[in-house]
Amino acid sequence: MTRVIKIEKNGGPEVLQIKNVQLPELPPDQVLIETKAIGLNYIDTYHRSGSYPVPLPSGIGVEASGIIKKIGSKIKNLSVGDNVAYGGLPIGSYADERIYPADKLVKLPDGITFEIAASIMTKGLTVFYLLYKTFPVKSHDTVLFHAAAGGVGQIFCQWAKSLGCKVIGTVGSDEKVTIAKKNGCDLVVNYSKENFVEKVMNFTKGMGVPVVY
């Protein structure tokens, strides 16, 4: 038996229930993971509330890290004892142990803690997709990122700067201005006080930006 957090109906935090469940037999292409850290994401609240409907009853959570306790018979590239992390479906990371597809796991390099891994997988993969797939940036591009002080925004600002970009970020408070600057924004606009379009055009000398995230 293992403990998991389940929802049987949609609602607020009160619908989260700790359940003891029996895990099924391990499929040949999956592994059993002992959870060490869980990433909390805003999408978890959407699944819980029903804003993003999921079949009920359901587990919750899309991101975690841990240690492999058992491997399926077809697994060749992972071993018992490996430290791994994941970010994405299937839902159910709020659990002491869980079974998860091996091909969706990332083996953790030395020096990356469980806590760091569980906090950046989903957000980091989102930033990778934005910078390399949605609009592949080039060095010296000036880019605009809304919500620059959020979890995704902080990673985005650091990553884009490492690629040689100039980063303009928008935030909603003075406190968040400080956070965005700390993470590399060249210009931070508090949209509750300032017109970000005017600020962007002034900063770019009327050229604008090739992409807005």
Residue ranges with predicted function:
Residues 65-90:
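A glycine-/small-residue-rich N-terminal strand-loop-strand element
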Residues 121-194, 198-199:
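Mid-domain Rossmann-like dinucleotide-binding core that forms the NAD(H)/NADP(H) cofactor-binding site
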